[in-house]
């Protein structure tokens, strides 16, 4: 989003989590960056990988991120936690802190194969640290409808998981413009607003927001019935 030298930032997610681990007082909003496209960001860098080693021996190690986010989340409509494609302590912290999960899966063989392991991890998190964790759905990304590999992978995902996990109608296509975005410091909407991939992300956002409104209505009806 335009902050190119993340290593020079005085405050990152690493500092926030480290303060929670040491039970130090902190201003939870210090260091949160505000982007011109109306998004706030808690930045991260490679130091987070080093902190992951410390989390292994921390007290309540799976709940460190949850404890930090509890201090800021009421100021936002949505908090998105963008996880690395790994199942380490940082990802376990994210799953423990989250209300629900959206699983992006590249329409390729190896990423799709990792679904079973991820679902097993989510099941363990539900059992031990976050019983209310829900899976909102699977988002298919880097979809190249011209290749047989992409078509067969999408079909396999729908066949193996579609009966128990929602697969979003919207798919994110392969696009050169999407690959260029991170180097430009802009979102796809600002960089190429009329592209196929920006339209796909907009359609996906509408799906997610519609789901959220439906959940709110169901919750309200359940509360009214009590």
Predicted regions and their residues:
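P-loop NTP-binding core
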Residues: 1-226
């Amino acid at each position: 989003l335009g902050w190119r030298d993340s290593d020079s930032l005085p405050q990152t997610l690493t500092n926030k989590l480290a303060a929670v681990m040491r039970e130090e007082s902190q201003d939870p909003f210090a260091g949160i960056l505000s982007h011109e496209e109306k998004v706030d960001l808690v930045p991260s860098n490679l130091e987070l990988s080093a902190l992951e080693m410390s989390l292994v021996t921390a007290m309540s190690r799976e709940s460190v991120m949850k404890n930090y986010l509890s201090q800021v989340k009421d100021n936002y409509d949505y908090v998105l936690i963008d996880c690395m494609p790994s199942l380490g302590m940082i990802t376990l912290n994210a799953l423990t802190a989250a209300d629900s999960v959206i699983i992006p899966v590249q329409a390729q063989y190896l990423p799709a194969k990792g679904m079973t392991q991820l679902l097993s991890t989510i099941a363990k998190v539900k059992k031990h640290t976050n019983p209310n964790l829900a899976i909102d759905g699977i988002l298919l990304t880097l979809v190249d409808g011209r290749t047989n590999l992409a078509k067969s992978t999408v079909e396999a995902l729908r066949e193996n998981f579609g009966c128990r996990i929602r697969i979003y109608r919207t798919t994110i296509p392969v696009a050169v413009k999407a690959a260029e975005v991170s180097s430009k410091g802009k979102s796809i909407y600002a960089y190429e607003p009329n592209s196929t991939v920006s339209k796909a992300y907009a359609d996906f956002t509408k799906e997610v927001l519609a789901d959220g409104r439906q959940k709110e209505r169901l919750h309200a009806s359940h509360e009214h019935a009590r």
